[in-house]
Amino acid sequence: MKIRILRDTETVRYAAEELKKYLYMMDSDIEAEICCEGDGEITLGLLSDLKLDNSDVKDAMVDDVVDVKIDSLSGYIAGSNERSILFGVYKYLKSAGCRWVRPGDEGEYIPKKDMSRHSFAYRKKADYPFRGQAIEGAVSFEHVRDTILWLPKVDMNLFQIEQIVPYNYMSRWYLHTANTKLPHDDIPYEDYVRYAAELELIVKKCGLQLHGLGHAALNEAFGIRYKAPYMTYDIPEDAKDALALVQGERKLFNGHPMQTHLCMSQKWVRDRVVNWLIDYMKEKPYIDFMHFWLADAINNQCECEDCKKKTPSDWYVEMLNEIDARLTEEKIDSKIIFIMYVDTLWPPIIEKLNNPSRFIMTTACGSGKGYSDKRREGGIPKWERNNYSIVGGLDMALTFIDGWKPIFDGPRFVYEYMFYTGHYADPGYMTFARKVAKDMKELRVTGFDGIMSDQTQRCYFPTGLPVSVFGEFLFDTSLDTEEYIDKYMQDSFGEGWREAKEYLEKISASFDPEAMKQNTDVTAQDTGCVDVNSKKAGIIGNEALGDIIATVPDTVDKFAPVIEKYITLSDKCHRESWRILKYHGIYCKGISDVYYALSRGDQKGALDIFWKFADKLSEIEMEIHPYFDLCLFHQRTKQVIAGK
C-alpha cells in the first residue's frame, strides 16, 4: 500500500513514517511505501490541502484540529497544522488498540491486528490550545528526548527548553547530585550546548510548539550566563551600572543572576537586552514562543530615582513593545510570552501593549488546589516597591488578570507545578490521577487556554497514568475518568491489570495524598509569602494516618507473588510495567518508614531513616531512572520532614 503525503516536510514525513512503522508492527502483511505523487490508499495533509472544513481554526499555530476518515486502509488523516496530522496518525493507531503508556520503547503497547478490517472516523478540535511541559528536575538528554517524542502520543503540543542551555536541570543528572553511590563527574559544557540544540530539532520534527528562554536570559546581554544556583558569578565591568540598585548597591541579588533585575529606566540597558534578544532570535527564528521574563525572587526591583518614576510593569511593557518592534522589523513572527509574576502581577499604569496580537500571557498561581472562578476579596492590593508580601493563589491571580484586561485580554495559560514534586504525595498515583482529570475538566471556568507543566520528565513511578491524563484530558475534557483509567491500566499491565489497579488503589489510600501535600506550594516557596492559617497538620504528629501507613509494607509483601506471576509476560510493555511495580514496592516500604516516624512527631528519626533509604534508592536508581527523579524526591522529602 501507499501512504501519500501532500506536503514533503520533516513533520509530515515523520507522521507518515510513524504510520508505516506501527502498521507493520500490528500487521506484518502491510509493507507501506511513502510517496508524494500519484494516488495513495491513505493520504496525509492539512485540512486545507484536502478541502476539508477548517472554519473552527482561528490560529493554526495554536489551534489543533484532527480529522481522520479511514475505512479498510483507505482514506485520509488531516490536521489544522502539521503536528495535528501526527496527532491524527496516533489517534488512528490508538483506535486500533495501540497505546503509549509512558516514554520510551518499552512504554509502547502495539497489539497484532488485521488492519484491513479496521475503520475509524474522527474529528476533534483540542479543547485547550496550550498543552505541554517545560524542562525541570534532574534529566538526561535521553530522558528529555524520549519525553518529547512521547508528547504527541498523549495529545500534548508544546515543550519549553528554559534557559539558553538547560545546564541547571541536565547537570543534576550527569553529576548524579542526589545519588550517594555514583560518581559526581560532570560532562563538558559543550555537550550540554549540543544536547539543547538536538532537543530543539526533535521538538520541531514533531511539529510541536517550541518555547524558549524564560528566567535567566535577562543578564545574557551583559555576559552573565546563569548555569546553576550553587555557582559563583563574576560581573563584567561594563555590566555593573546595568544592574538594579537595591539597598544602595548594584550587584547580583543573592549572588544569583536569575534573581537579579536590571535598571530598566536606562535606555542603553534596554537597548542592549533587546539587541541581544533579536540577535538570538535571528539565529533561532524557529522558536515559536519566546518567553521574556524578568528576574525571579522578591524585593529586588531597582530603587534608583528614574526607575521609581514608573512601576516594574510599566518598564516591562515598554521593553516588550521595543522587542516587538524589532521583531517586526526583522520579519520574525515568533510570539512573545510575558509573565504576570510577583511585581508584574500589578497591571501597568502608563504603558500599553502596542501590538497585543504578538503576545501570550502566562502566570504561576500555585498547584494542587483545583480551579474555580473565584476572586480575592478586597480586589487588587496596593503595590509597594520592594515590600512584596501578598499570598498568592488562583483567586489572587484571577483578580490581577481582571486588572490587566484593559491592557491585554488575549490568550493566556497557567504555568503549573503539579508534576514538579506533587506526585510524590501519592505513591500509588491513583488519587492523584483522578485529581488531575478533575482539574483539567474544571480549568475552563478560569478563562485560561491551557497549561504549561513545569515538571520533571521522570514521573512514571509506578505508572504514566497521571501525565497521560494531563495531556489527553486537556485535548478532550469529555473523556470519562473511570473508563480512561481502566483502559490505561489494561493497556499498561495486560493480564492481571485489575489486580494491579486494586493494589495501587490501596497504596494511594494508605498514604492519603491530601494530607501528604506540602504546606507551601512552589510559588510560596519562591516568594516566602505563606498564609499560616492555611497550613495543614499533614503527616507530622498525625498518628491516625501513621497507623494506616504502617500497613503498607504488609500490602507490598502480600502483592509480591502477583508481580512474580506476571513479570514474565510476553509483551514488552506489560513486562516492563510489572518490573517497575516490583521496584516500586521497595520504594513504598521505605517511604512508609519515613512517614511513620513523622506521624509520631520524630522528625530527627525520620531524617535518619530517610538517609538510609536514600542509599537504597541510590543503589537501584539505574534500574528505574527513566521513571523516577531521585533528585526531586530528595528535595521534596526533606522539605516534608522539615514541616515545610
Give residue ranges: language-model regions:
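Conserved, mostly hydrophobic/aromatic
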Residues: 23, 81, 151, 273, ...
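Short glycine-biased active-site loop of nucleotidyltransferases that positions the nucleotide triphosphate
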Residues: 226, 348-355, 429, 461-463
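Structured mid-domain segments that build the active-site/substrate or prosthetic-cofactor binding neighborhood
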Residues: 269, 279, 381-498, 502
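Gly/Pro-rich turn-and-neighbor structural signature
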Residues: 197, 258-261, 265-405, 416
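Feature activates predominantly on carbohydrate-active enzymes
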Residues: 2, 8, 12-18, 22, ...
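Catalytic domains of carbohydrate-active enzymes that cleave complex glycans
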Residues: 447, 472-644
